[in-house]
Amino acid sequence: MKKPLGKIVASTALLISVAFSSSIASAAEEAKEKYLIGFNEQEAVSEFVEQIEANDDVAILSEEEEVEIELLHEFETIPVLSVELSPEDVDALELDPTISYIEEDAEVTTMAQSVPWGISRVQAPAAHNRGLTGSGVKVAVLDTGISTHPDLNIRGGASFVPGEPSTQDGNGHGTHVAGTIAALNNSIGVLGVAPSAELYAVKVLGASGSGSVSSIAQGLEWAGNNGMHVANLSLGSPSPSATLEQAVNSATSRGVLVVAASGNSGAGSISYPARYANAMAVGATDQNNNRASFSQYGAGLDIVAPGVNVQSTYPGSTYASLNGTSMATPHVAGVAALVKQKNPSWSNVQIRNHLKNTATGLGNTNLYGSGLVNAEAATR
């Protein structure tokens, strides 16, 4: 999450909807909201979709009850549907034995050539001197998009934000994150941790800096389907989501190292998705290697990285200094890319464990996890 000279707090404004209809009585259509329906198995998803498509967006629950559903997205790798319903119909649908859960499609927000201090602090130049710059490693930036910039080489991507088909960044957050990962070594601007890594702009947050769980889950699915080695998620929410956890697990099972921001509220608990076991949770430190006051901590924190006054790329071919665990997370994603280049046969789990084992200990593991990510030690 981005903290531009102030505090940006992860929020969960909810975007949900449902519509109730009956074969006996018809009332004025209720306002619809967005939900995620999780099924026990993939076959049940297909059968459910076939039924609502055959009945003009209506699920028939019994002879006397129907539920009007608008299908928004069918996930390929997890048994989940993104739909619009009226809230009154949720209880009726939950009685279907093939449905595991129904949850609101909650909103998730950003956690918001000189060599920036953070790049030096994680000792990335030492790895560069060994010829390790992230070459051949694919890093997906699940964020607000990435703007065209002379200091960035964007290889591709996709947008999962309704109404924003372009992967260009209308906020600034994603472009800043991308620069910390892979700003080019081109004698201008700033230098990234892994300047030769392949950047992919996966837009899951809109210009406002927020987005839905379904968009983020689709972004993770895209990362798994397109052979990404690392996925940077500088975003979070205080609320759990079964769909988002499944998406993290699915991406991890397909070889993606999911690196996520711990959150910016300063609380002694980690935000989601960073709190999930298969996500690598990253906290923020300042120039004195102390925990940044805003950085969330606690059980499940894996590692820390610089997150205060971080200078990086910004839209309009400019540069900006921002604060946040969002700024810390791409330092870790970048070091992961360096390790992957050096050890191309290593799995995401091996890379995650290696980053933790080679981190510089800073004391209290509740505050710092395994310590400060260390590119020099990780690439020896």
UniProtKB/Swiss-Prot annotation:
Gene Ontology molecular function: metal ion binding; serine-type endopeptidase activity
Entry's pH dependence statement: Optimum pH is 12.3.
Control of this protein's activity: Activity is inhibited by phenylmethylsulfonyl fluoride and chymostatin.
Location(s), subcellular: Secreted
Binding site for Ca(2+) 1: Q113, D151, L184, N186, I188, V190
Entry GO terms, CC: extracellular region
Positions of the propeptide removed during maturation: 28-111
Cofactor note text: Binds 2 calcium ions per subunit.
EC nos: 3.4.21.-
Protein name: M-protease
Cofactor(s) annotated in UniProt: Ca(2+)
Taxonomic lineage from the root: Bacteria, Bacillati, Bacillota, Bacilli, Bacillales
UniProt domain Peptidase S8: residue ranges: 116-379
Entry annotation: catalytic residues: D143 (charge relay system), H173 (charge relay system), S326 (charge relay system)
Domain Inhibitor I9, first and last residues per copy: 34-111
Family the UniProt entry places it in: Belongs to the peptidase S8 family.
Annotated positions binding Ca(2+) 2: A274, Y276, A279, D302
Role: Alkaline serine protease that cleaves various substrates, including N-succinyl-Ala-Ala-Pro-Phe-pNA, N-succinyl-Ala-Ala-Pro-MetpNA, oxidized insulin B chain, casein, hemoglobin and scleroproteins, such as keratin, alpha-keratin and elastin.
Alphabetical list of InterPro entries matching this protein: Peptidase_S8/S53_dom, Peptidase_S8/S53_dom_sf, Peptidase_S8_Asp-AS, Peptidase_S8_His-AS, Peptidase_S8_Ser-AS, Peptidase_S8_subtilisin-like, Peptidase_S8_subtilisin-rel, S8pro/Inhibitor_I9
Chief location category: secreted
An individual GO BP term: proteolysis
Leader sequence segment: 1-27
